[in-house]
Amino acid sequence: MLLVSTVSAVPGLFSPPSSPSNSSQEELLDDRDPLLVRAELALLSTIFVAVALSNGLVLGALIRRGRRGRWAPMHVFISHLCLADLAVALFQVLPQLAWDATDRFHGPDALCRAVKYLQMVGMYASSYMILAMTLDRHRAICRPMLAYRHGGGARWNRPVLVAWAFSLLLSLPQLFIFAQRDVGNGSGVFDCWARFAEPWGLRAYVTWIALMVFVAPALGIAACQVLIFREIHASLVPGPSERAGRRRRGRRTGSPSEGAHVSAAMAKTVRMTLVIVIVYVLCWAPFFLVQLWAAWDPEAPLERPPFVLLMLLASLNSCTNPWIYASFSSSVSSELRSLLCCAQRHTTHSLGPQDESCATASSSLMKDTPS
């Protein structure tokens, strides 16, 4: 479950713990704790179902809504975030589930490299899509004249393309670091492991991944959200010159209802800001802390159950992403309720008031303003 492995030390990205290279043939067999293996499989299965189901539902709701009109900019980002998280489920969690079940990677060298590459693509894409979405919200609020200059409502806009391009590019080292290698000095037992030219290569690479996948996006997201909050706060609290102008005119600019609407919008933005940053840090921090610990400390408890289970939580953020943005988007949450309502109708094969409620929900969404 470590990010990378050498043939003499630690297991590979999301691979089960393996024996060191000087082990005998008997020791290279699967001697893992059966209870721990079952716990790993149960945890990975739960994460896979949660990621696939939640992102599939939200993506289905967005596609259903998009068929009836132009895609809103926020919906474009949420849909690509769902795609990135589905890539995490299919190319990261599912291979790890099979890997944990068999203890060794069973497949050719090309498949080993492809799996490792796609695992990292999913991690980068999920983080960078959130960062791209936050940058777009910052531009829309703080630089509104530039918000839609580059095709904000298109299904593929510039921030989305940049996020995918960086994810594909930064994952390329995986193709050269990992390969099917003998884990026991001629034992004939092979696993998908990494090899570095220098002893410090493992520490440098794990630290680089932690910075690029977790630290840098987290700082960027937090900075953008602070700037968004400051911009909204500045629009609500007039400066000295604006207050003087209002006194000279002898009247207020704007109605109480308009001010209340802006205050509600700011409160919603602040809540979303806190949720995004806190959940992002809480989901990624345990995983990368144990990764860095394992890379920098030769005495790290690699096979202790808490340590092993924490290494499986790289995809935890993909479980929460769709629900965070769906809950703060009235149009997405309404479409999701309508989709679930109609799915229940088809499941029960019932006609009558339930059909009418589905139709009413769908028609009302046509007038819903994207948020």
Curated annotation (Swiss-Prot):
S-palmitoyl cysteine: lipidated positions: C341, C342
Gene Ontology CC annotation, any one: perinuclear region of cytoplasm
Annotated GO MF terms: peptide hormone binding; signaling receptor activity; vasopressin receptor activity
Keyword Transferase in annotation: no
Membrane spanning stretches: 39-63, 78-98, 114-135, 160-180, 201-220, 272-293, 309-328
Subcellular location: Cell membrane
Source species, domain of life: Eukaryota
Listed Gene3D superfamilies: Rhodopsin 7-helix transmembrane proteins
Biased composition (Polar residues): 357-371
Complex and partners: Interacts with ARRDC4. Identified in a complex containing at least ARRDC4, V2R and HGS. Interacts with TMEM147.
Listed name of the protein: Vasopressin V2 receptor
Lineage, highest ranks first: Eukaryota, Metazoa, Chordata, Craniata, Vertebrata
Gene: Avpr2
